[in-house]
């Protein structure tokens, strides 16, 4: 069944910030039919590009039940626990994931690359063996948002979603991820589909695709609980995602 929820806008607040600062984002979403159960929002920090063992759930928030219409709330979370991140992965590029579930079923996964680096030039040139956390800055790359959606059962009457294809377990390049907005399509085949949106989005594992990006970052080839105060205004229309200025 088609999704009953559309994520209209995610504004990353206080970006850039220091590594030890809280993550804070303002989320605006539309509900097309009344949802009797909570939406569960979860913010995850990917601590390593080689293993999920270092993923940290920074916080989660339950919002609901939710009437039809447009809603907004602010979700904040503490910074990741440094002791749970491999030392070699603290400085450099990481990934931040925002997931949303309904009835314990994940239906959207949004990911941003995060650049953690020193603001001091000398520390950049000669980074200490043990990272100085209080000197690290953090910038979420909002222009490089990646979105993956999944079919779920919104009601008991909905058909059971098909199992995920084994292809989803393979490592994907970043080009296989679906950007929320596509500013330009070079292929003729894509131009023919400008006015159409595919019914389903293939599941892509952001954690796995991060492997290549992390390796490139280390090689120097790339630089790169919730506050549930809801607002309901009944407005409609698309809003581009980005960070708040």
Swiss-Prot record:
Stretches the record annotates as Disordered: 157-245
GO cellular component, one term: chromatin
Lineage top rank: taxon: Eukaryota
GO biological process: DNA replication; DNA replication-dependent chromatin assembly; nucleosome assembly; nucleosome disassembly; oogenesis; regulation of brood size; spermatogenesis
GO molecular function, a single term: histone binding
Function comment: Histone chaperone that facilitates histone deposition and histone exchange and removal during nucleosome assembly and disassembly.
Name of the protein described by the UniProt record: Probable histone chaperone asf-1-like protein
Organism: Caenorhabditis elegans
Gene: asfl-1
